[in-house]
Amino acid sequence: MAFKTTSVATTTSASTKPTVDFDALNDFVVEQVGCQQPETLNGVIVGIIDLGNQKLPDAEYDVDSGDEDLSVEELEAKYADEIEAGKISKFDFVKDWSTRPPKDVIKKFVPQKDRQCISYCVDFPDVMLDKGQFFGENSEPKPLRLYFGGQYYHQGLKKMIVQNLLPLKLSNIAKDPRNDKLWSLNPKSQLHKMAVASKIINTGEAFLPDQIDELLGKTLQFKVQIGFNEKGDKKYYFEKMSFLGAIQRKDKPFENVDVFLIQMDDENDPEALKQIRKHLLNTMEMATNFEGSALQKQLLEVRPQSFGGTSSSAVVKKETPKAVVEPVASDSNEDDDDWS
């Protein structure tokens, strides 16, 4: 997909923002969308956001064959050298929900390398919302926009961050992996499934991380739910979205949509940067390659208020973006689809 190249002059300042009644805004969205129960909607991928190289949680595995009857202490003693070398993080109990009743089982936890991760956002043009009234802006209905990955409050950081990251991990998908190499995002990964559903590739073909921008503008089916979780006398707004598959034959793809690609080390569209939600910015800040990146510099110019700073006017030139990734080969731990 070709991106337009334009020059954009952007003036920003630490001006006072309008006070937003988020309770009223959330009530409005829930009522207007009408998806308190999960519903299938056609949506178009309009944005891909590079979250940088993120530290991932330990991978969880079954204990090795022959170790099933050992206790945690016995496993720690047997693999003391591997634990000291950092090849194994720990052995610990986890709840096995596949049994009835659920039972505690011992799992092996192994460190994962930092990996480049992304998120993406989807517009649903069949659901138009006019949020201007809540932000002191002119009336301008826009499609419902949802971001993959959900969000949660990180107690240590004291801020909201992305809950489910999409790591760009490669697997050897050759039919004879011992003798041949065919590197690709894992066929079980969400991004590979999207590529097949949107007919970018056929089943069994490779889909590489530097191809993910080809998903921009593609119309697919998603499961959507927007509502409130009630706890005591309080209610908490939530948005859920997960990829389902290709659209039905009778449906037409959405056309003439504006798309954007945000990357860590490229010039990005200032207008797109202004629209990124705060939990995505918070997650970008956690990336090991965020400090000193081109993206950090641009965000400090375009959105200084999001980082506690100020900025004078800045002129940013948009260039044609290309998906630039640093994939790490892996034969395991594919990212599964999350109902996030």
Identify the function of each model-found stretch.
Residues 2-340:
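Short beta-rich binding modules
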